[in-house]
Amino acid sequence: MSGNGHLRGLAAFVAGWRSVLTGLGITGRIALQKPVTVRYPAEKVVLSPRWRGALRLRGMLGRDEIPLVTSDPPSYNGVIDGLHRTERLAPCVGNCPANVDARGQNYLVAEGKLVEAYELVRERNILPGVLGRICHHPCESACRRNYYDEPVAVRPLHRLVAEEYAKTERDVRPLPKTRGKTVAVIGSGPSGLAAALDLMRLGYTVEMFEKEDKPGGALYSGVPSYRLPRDVLHSEIDGLVKLGLDLRCGVEIGKDVTMAKVIEDHDAVLLCVGLQVSRLLPIPGNDAEGVMGALEFLRAANWKGDAGVQGKRVFVIGGGNVAVDVARCAVRVGASEVKLGCLEAPNEMPCHPWEIEEALDEGVVAMCSQAPDSVLEEDGKVVGMRLRDCLSVFDEAGRFAPQYGEGTTDVPCDVVVFAIGQASKLDTIIEGTGLQLNERGILIVDGSTAATTAPGVFASGEVVTGPGSAIASIATGHEAAHSIHRYLQGEDLAERRIPRPVPVYPKRQPALLEGVETYRLRKQMPMARPEDRVTDFRPVELGLTHQEGLAEAARCLRCQSEVCVGCTFCARTCPDYAIAVERVDEPGVRCLTRYDLDVSKCCFCGLCAEQCPTNALTHTGQYELSFYHRPLLTFDKGEMLRDGGGTRATGRDGIDSPSCPTRREGTRL
């Protein structure tokens, strides 16, 4: 062999061993790493495959009840915290600011128990019929059906159960007043109503003061009746009055009676007056005739049905939900043209996407990426709006830092409505009370206890949090009621107090719906036609029928209930086809006829348990099955439902002939 041949052979030998050593190094590094399983749909504790024992089912629909989330007001946070810590908190419940038991509602509706569903919902959402029309439904954004098709229509189901409850004739009696103490609630918005009901349940006498002639706060004065019919609002508030709420409308604190007098006459006071004044931009022309604030415009449109814009061109400044409400109301009260201008690009607008879509359908013109520069006027009257190009709204860190271009656009108009935010008006209320405002004019309040700087005076709602949602205001009312109860019982406001847990759920894109069976898709809310709804303030959303509601509720996966609902996701996920699931193939049936696990095929990867939306599928302590030789071995339904001790059951645990109590005509998962 020549010298060159020897060199080539040596080079190949060295290269081969280098490859082997490199591979061993990679293998060693991987071996030292922690094994990782798929984090979908929720992160779980990561276990090595050899420490996963045989699978079992904790429960099964038709044999086991779905647990309901219920408790007395002071203990509710503790219940939610316990469920969260033990991974038994349904995402829809955890993502709701008030922790309304949407899962329990869906279960009861699917069972045909709509009145019971209403009573369950009202424990935390004191106005189910109202929120069933206007809530921004964060529960639906956390719904696990987003992974597979579309979320369950929780908000429309709130409305349905409220409508069914209203049809019943029930003997409502006042709640007993057992405490001998009186609490004053100033303001009849959602926060005040929630606190009032909690305090009445605890045995206190509650007196509520409202400066307007009708109760409801911003729900009455600010939400258009095409979204929230006034009879629905007043009917639900009347229900609270029947429970013993002493409601006094037409009484303005600071004018008709002083705040100091209210504090003197009551054992505790809750201030929840909301935000009563619109903010205006400090730009030239903002004092011209024809310039209005959003709240003033909405009050005129809602109360009088005439905001003085008949036949006029209206320009709305703002991109939030209030701005969209103003624009849609302007169309309904006879404006000849309605335009909406905002800083944000179309995909950045802070309003809910469905709100602006409905506004565009009704003829509103959106001018995005435009900043208000000045109001054009002649002889003191509005003749137009000058806009400047807005290049960006937020900086790289996500902070509000708009950048403007040089280009401007003049838009002819007769009326300009500022819908850029609201502020509180507390000057006359706090005089001589010990209540203090900070340098920005905002009431000083302890964020964890709702206590103000005046002893025995608490605050909640938007006067504390700023502009927000109705359900968020309701949540602050619950917390304030808890603090008032502690105060009146002589307890420390913060000691051993459990704050409401705020789980973080991953944001995700909607599932691809191509090929999804139509019976699995969400029941869409029937809507009035755009050409019909712009002529008056009749409701835009028409509501689900009773049958549609039952079918929609049956789509709920009963997440974290530890009860198998027959969704078959485990069988579809299993890479080794070790799971076989069969159920009765009839409309309305949610009972399994077969659940088999072929242990000889199972690779103990854990994907099925991680995929299970209800947390019903879990690993037992039968670790030996995961790494010793496994003969042909199949667990049937009865064995899958055995107890958690690891001992195989010999029978079928009394479920040979499932009664299928969840049959409903025309419903299907």
Name the predicted role of every residue range.
Residues 161-177, 235-255, 278-333, 437-448, ...:
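Glycine-rich dinucleotide-binding loop and its adjacent helix/turn
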Residues 287-312, 395-467:
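FAD-site-proximal beta/loop scaffold in flavoenzymes
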Residues 55-111, 125-154, 192-194, 462, ...:
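Cysteine-centered iron-sulfur cluster-binding motifs in ferredoxin-type domains/subunits
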Residues 116, 177, 182-186, 234-283, ...:
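Feature captures the FAD/FMN-dependent oxidoreductase FAD-binding
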Residues 326, 460-488:
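A conserved FAD-binding loop/helix module that cradles the flavin
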Residues 1-15, 65-85, 152-182, 201, ...:
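Flanking helices and flexible, charged tails adjoining ferredoxin-like Fe-S electron-transfer domains
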Residues 205-208, 212-243, 247, 301, ...:
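Rossmann-like dinucleotide-binding cores of NAD(P)H-dependent redox enzymes
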Residues 182-207, 323-331:
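N-terminal Rossmann-like FAD-binding beta1-loop-alpha1 element of flavoenzymes
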